[in-house]
Amino acid sequence: MGIDYSTLKNRQRLERVNYPDNLGLRVHRALSWLNRAEQEADPDSRFIFLWIAFNAAYATDIDDREGLSEQRTFNAFLEKLQALDTTHRLNNLVWDAYPNAIRVLLDNPYVFSCFWDYQKGQKTEDQWKHSFDAAKKAANTALAKQDTPRLLAIVLSRIYTLRNQLVHGGATWNSSVNRDQIRDCVNIMGELVTAVIEIMMDSPNTLWG
């Protein structure tokens, strides 16, 4: 990880007096969970702490009635981050650091929410497969256009599905079944959370919500 909690915390201590209250609280909370994540050796727990850190920065309720990647507020947040990312941290994350892990994640039905709706009898097999094909097509379009915010929204919707499996008891702790997904998601989220916090700190006068 290029930038860690200590680096960001030291900077925050120097700058926080100049942060608007809303930004200051988001950064403070996100850093506290990033710190906890970096201390955690267990991958499942580290993953959960990293998601909390990201959610602390986002600081907006996620409506489970609609797919995360389709939520207007969430997409606007990612687009704002991309527009303010003058050193291309998000682009580097998606296109240089983890392109293979991201492609594997996008092709994995077990981190696609409609698959689990099918398992619970809420969707038919044809419905979930149609949704999965449509989602892969959307992801491929984002890949072809190198549309970083759109691709991140789709990737994070998959990561959110994995988060839900763990938090709601739908997966076994330390399960061999999801080790690859957990490992990749921990790596991606570790880089993403630090990038998001840094971009927000770079733009204290931006309205963050």
Task: Show the residue positions of the predicted features.
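Helix-loop junctions and short alpha-helical segments
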Residues: G2-N22, L50-A142
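Polyanionic, low-complexity intrinsically disordered segments
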Residues: I3-R13, V17, D21, Y118-G209
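Helix-boundary capping/turn motifs
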Residues: D21-A30, P43-D44, R158-L162
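Short amphipathic alpha-helical segments and their helix-coil junctions
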Residues: G24-A41, A138-A142
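Short, hydrophobic/amphipathic alpha-helical patches that form generic packing surfaces
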Residues: S32-R36, I48-A59, R158
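Short, surface-exposed loop/turn segments at secondary-structure junctions
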Residues: E40, R65-L68, W173-R179
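Short, solvent-exposed positions on alpha-helices
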Residues: D44-I48, S176
